[in-house]
């Protein structure tokens, strides 16, 4: 409380004094050894100005950069050092130290048609990804990603990523779900490059290490509040420094959002507690649309009772799912791919087994993942992390007994709509329009390469390909050092007012209580299987919960490391994502990919692709559902929906588009 009595100018003075002392100390201690490229406080020669134009209660600092990246996971780091490498004065804002980002938790691998295990072709990878998306993916973006995949993996290898190897010294590639050879006619593909079962950990640390070569200014433990938008253009970001409570406005010609997904809208998920849809919500508050948020991936194998991820790589190495009768039940649901069918197919199959009484345990509410038939040496070399995780969270020795698993929320296919260059788009009068100065990549974005369902090991690929694409696109559009667009003197005023409102919120409901209500509503009303009545009830419940945001109570009135307020800011972001997710799901009256409606069990395309389309009348755009959902939320929490067409054309003649067909494995 004593801090409240100190003038903001004095607080800022103290903070800058401490910063200067630490920087000088660091520079002195290591200058003799090497040039110092990294500091959590940003580059030493960065010009920053103190302002009181939007608040007299908080220190406000203005920064100018060519580009600012929000988020320092795989996508954010790749975008940030790509921009710095091209000569752009770049800031990277992150609420976590970079290596704490959720990319670190990815286990299975990264897809690329290297052909190290058998002949492969990136066009076959393209086909599998389009099919996996249930024909909701944009084929120009999928073309770009799969064609760039081999070069992206080789680039990572050159950066020092320690891939697992074959006996011949090549990058080891394992089987993964939904992957095939020869356009689905050549059997199972081995396309997933991995570092045992800790691929995300290696990827993130490799990219972070690479990023230290460049003079990117990192602002670590800064919470991005909102975009600075003027006249339909993005001109930067406003953020809160959590360490000292100061406000920072980053004016930039280009802004890249790489803030990850919003898995924490659900009660049980594999996501870190920091996956709160911050960038998605920032875009929503800016009046821009989000795309396809109803498509939430349930990973088939989360540890029962804990929700921790058990990688698909287990099944790629030969693991099998069994029910209470000891039956390898996936043989009934996917006779060809079996346990390596696409994730949405496996999750639904597991749920059906449990519903029909063939689940395991006394409550019949999970199934088993069996690994103990595999050689212990294989488990030790290929799945060491899983062996450890299963012992810690399930008390299971994988060499002797099966792991109890059930479907768990894992990934968000939807996000901020972009084109294949990473440029954020809106849809106006039937046409896609680029939002000047705004880019997005990674799980925060929807390019849309995943459509209605993501293939395993395409997410890490998405990060590096489109993180790099954002940097390349900005380099095509701009030059380093160009004049920056102006911002209004009071830009960000509403963000600071909201922060202050939450800091002194004195209602009757705790943030944690409201968050739990939201998460349990999403868990029960927008699950693996969905029905109209349950979704509608969920929409109504979430609307009530959102209204209760006005009755929040926070307890910490300070400005230094006020985690109470930060969690409440994250709840605001989660709520915007949850509202759009469940309303979009209620409106989509079909089953496609991860969106499975029990009252609308079939996919509704422009034609009935179960039979020849010759002689069929093509459905109008309003009559079918092979289209992207665009969702908006107004200041009162009301969701409105629009739709935009799926892009079926590829980038060029090197790759033919894949027409819709019945999806089976």
From Swiss-Prot:
It catalyses: a ubiquinone + succinate = a ubiquinol + fumarate; (R)-malate + a quinone = enol-oxaloacetate + a quinol; (S)-malate + a quinone = enol-oxaloacetate + a quinol. The modification Tele-8alpha-FAD histidine is found at residue 102. Flavoprotein (FP) subunit of succinate dehydrogenase (SDH) that is involved in complex II of the mitochondrial electron transport chain and is responsible for transferring electrons from succinate to ubiquinone (coenzyme Q). SDH also oxidizes malate to the non-canonical enol form of oxaloacetate, enol-oxaloacetate. Enol-oxaloacetate, which is a potent inhibitor of the succinate dehydrogenase activity, is further isomerized into keto-oxaloacetate. Pathway: Carbohydrate metabolism; tricarboxylic acid cycle; fumarate from succinate (eukaryal route): step 1/1. It is found in: Mitochondrion inner membrane. The active site is at 343 (proton acceptor). Belongs to the FAD-dependent oxidoreductase 2 family. FRD/SDH subfamily. GO terms for molecular function: electron transfer activity; flavin adenine dinucleotide binding; succinate dehydrogenase (quinone) activity. Keywords: Electron transport, FAD, Flavoprotein, Membrane, Mitochondrion, Mitochondrion inner membrane, Oxidoreductase, Transit peptide, Transport, Tricarboxylic acid cycle. This is Succinate dehydrogenase [ubiquinone] flavoprotein subunit B, mitochondrial.
